[in-house]
């Protein structure tokens, strides 16, 4: 077995298809700079996109992925529930890492794993915020 980290970078790919500015800056997709950088670090990296069969996340791809990087912004609802279930199983049962980027906090997979709506809420009241470090060595 290869000892290098196996990473799959997933991208919904919607901005590249609809925004000429994004197309010009990222002609190979928003995911490609991430793929290229991680490859330079010696990782085995592949990409997957929403428009591929099974969103590029077939069982063989998932079984050969140590870390899944997820980039999503506006096509969260287009991701099939059965694919979300497969990713969830790999994360929870098999220990696959998941790094969720940008607006991926609102993706189906992130919401399912967190068990919340993942709606962003905040207030600006000028109050002091306290953060407790309960496990400094973690």
Predicted feature descriptions by range:
Residues 1-64:
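Aromatic-Pro/Gly-enriched surface loop or interdomain linker
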């Amino acid at each position: 077995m290869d000892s290098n980290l196996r990473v799959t970078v997933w991208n919904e790919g919607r901005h590249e298809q609809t925004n000429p500015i994004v197309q010009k800056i990222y002609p190979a997709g928003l995911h490609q700079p991430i793929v290229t950088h991680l490859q330079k670090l010696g990782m085995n990296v592949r990409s997957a996109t929403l428009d591929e069969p099974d969103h590029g996340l077939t069982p063989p791809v998932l079984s050969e992925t140590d870390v899944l990087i997820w980039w999503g912004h506006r096509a969260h609802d287009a991701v099939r529930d059965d694919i979300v279930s497969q990713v969830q199983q790999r994360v929870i049962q098999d220990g696959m890492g998941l790094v969720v980027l940008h607006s991926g906090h609102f993706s189906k997979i992130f919401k399912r794993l967190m068990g919340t709506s993942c709606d962003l809420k905040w207030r600006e009241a000028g109050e002091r915020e306290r953060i407790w470090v309960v496990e400094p060595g973690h």
